Structure formats: structure tokens, C-alpha cells
Amino acid sequence: MSGPCPRFPFCGFDLKAEIVRIAAMEPNYSKLAGVLTGFSTNLQKGERVLIDAFDIPEAMVVALVRAAREQGAVPFVNLQRARVSRELVNGIDDEQFETQAAWELARMQKMDAYIAVRGSDNIFEMSDVDPRKVSRVMRAMKGVLDYRVNQTKWVILRWPTPAMAQQALMSTEGFEGFFFRVCTQDYGRMIEGMAALEKLMTATDRVELKGPNTDLRFSIKGIKAVACGGRHNIPDGEVFSCPVKDSVEGEITYNAPTVYQGTSFDNIHLKFEKGKIVHADGSNRGRLNEILNSDAGARYIGEFAIGFNPHILEPMRDILFDEKIAGSFHFTPGQAYEEADNGNRSQVHWDMVQILSLIHI
């Protein structure tokens, strides 16, 4: 070999071009890290923050560490890889479940804030894992999740990957540009604009949802509405509440695709009586009902939310984006949030999205 070659012909990878691309992206990394540490979690001097990094560039992790320190906070980092996680879950036993959950909870209890950035080269990485093991992991980790949601300042976002660009039917470069525009927009201004809807939903009793194969009626009386503008999710743009647990009657067909526990679902159709899902159909019907049978609360609704991010217009099989689609709502089987609580408890929290129905409140 006469010398180092920046191009590897066996895979078409251009090392020099990739270095240039990463260098060009670093200002975006710094800006996004500033949003997450400054606006979303509002880190203060001396606060401990856990940075959970799933399959994301090292440069973004470094940007988050630096941004946290600029806020005076103390950063801790947990690096995770999807293929490693899959292998661990595949062979896990009860003793390891308990040890892992206890260790994760002890660590979380030392934290004041939590930032998770989740990338994925393959959203179906867990699709061939025994569903019973996935459910067992979720049950074991529920205490960690509950503590993180209710006792820390937290924010979660996806990381733009070629796989996500494919889901969105966009080029990788085009999707990256879209991602950083959406994730670094002026969320303070968005919060101001949501106040009227939050007030209306807080004062509302009856809600009716009508659309193709959809006719739902329920009450949200006495349950708080919460405006979400970049504090917990990036991207953001929704106001959520929750139905009175036994008030939901009727049926709904979700017209946005959804991926949950590594399985893709389309055209989910649910029927309700006295708040409970009494019939569930759609693609992967067997797996759908397995999830809804995970526990008693999985067949009741834990969230009703209206989405309105003006930059997000089409579904892309990523719920952190899809639940914010302008003109959409999500109606979520499973766990209710404490901020808007109907008392439903479950290891499941499955945001399912419908676009462009008629909403009467």
C-alpha cells in the first residue's frame, strides 16, 4: 500500500468527507446541548445530571458534558448500545432483573436531572426478543421510570440517523437539517402560545372525537391540562390531560403507524366500554393484545393530548415526533402521569396517534 487512502472502496465510505461533515455539525451539537441543559432541565450549580447516551456520536456526548458544566452542574454519563442491550435482555434471568433494577434505581436517586438522547440504526432491533422478557424488563424498571419522571428534571429526545431519515422518506442531510430546526426552535415562545388551549382543556368536562371509524366520548372534568413546550420532550408541542378512568365510550381507529417494544403496528382499532378496551384489532393483532394484557391498567387510557408543532406534518414511526404532528391527538393506553392523573397504573404507556379528526370540547 503506497499510503493511507481516505476512501475505502469496499464500502464506499469517505473518511475525509465524514470528518468534514461532523465538524460542520458541531455548532448544532452545541446549540442543542444548550437547549437541553439550559432550557429543558434548567440545570443549576451543583446539581447532578445523568446523561444517558444511546447510539449517538461521541461529539454530542462531549457537547452535553461541556454544556452541563457551563451551567455549574455535575455531569455523569451512561453509554448504551442497542445490540448490547438486545443481547443482555435475551439472556437475562430473574436475579439479574432484580440486581439491574436495584442498581439503576440507586443511581437515579442520586440525580437531580436526567437527559436521554436516543439514536437507533434499526428501530426493530428488539423485534425478535421474547416479548415476555421485554415485559419483564419493563416491570422491573418501572420503579426507576417512576422515580425519574416524578423526582427529577428530565428531558428525552431522539438522535437523527439514516434509519430515521428513511422512515421520514428524506435524505440523511435533509433530515438532519429538519431535526435541528425542530429541536432548537424557540420553545419559550411556544409555551406562551399554548396558554389558551391549556386553560380551555382545564375547564372542560366532556370531549367528543369524531373521524373515520372513530366516535369517542369521555370526560376530563377535574383533571389538570398541562402544556408541553420543550421541558420534557424535544421536539415538543402538545397539551395533555387524561380521561376520567371509566368515562371512555366508543371506538377509535389510529391512522398513524406506531412502533412499540420493537414491533410495528398499523391501523389499530380499539373499542371501549366504561373506560376499558374491550376489543383491539389491527396489524400484529396477537402482539397488540399481548401488550394490552401486560397488566390491568394497560387496557385503560392514561393520557389524552392535542399536538400542534408547526414543523411536524407527517408521521415517521417515531413517537417523539409523531405525537406532536400539527392537527393530531394521541389517546394513550396505560400509565397516567401524576401531573394529570386519573389513577391508572401500568407498566405500559403507549402513545397512539390519530391525525385530523374533529374534536369537540
Describe these PLM feature segments.
Residues 16-21:
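Short, positively charged and aromatic/hydrophobic N-terminal segments
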Residues 279-343:
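Dual-mode signal for accessory low-complexity, basic/Gly-rich regions
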Residues 23-250:
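Active-site bordering "gate/hinge" segments
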Residues 56, 120-122, 161, 223, ...:
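Short, glycine-/Ser/Thr-/acidic-enriched flexible segments
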Residues 359-361:
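Conserved small/polar residues in nucleotide/adenosyl-binding loops
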Residues 239-280:
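Oxyanion-binding "anion nests"
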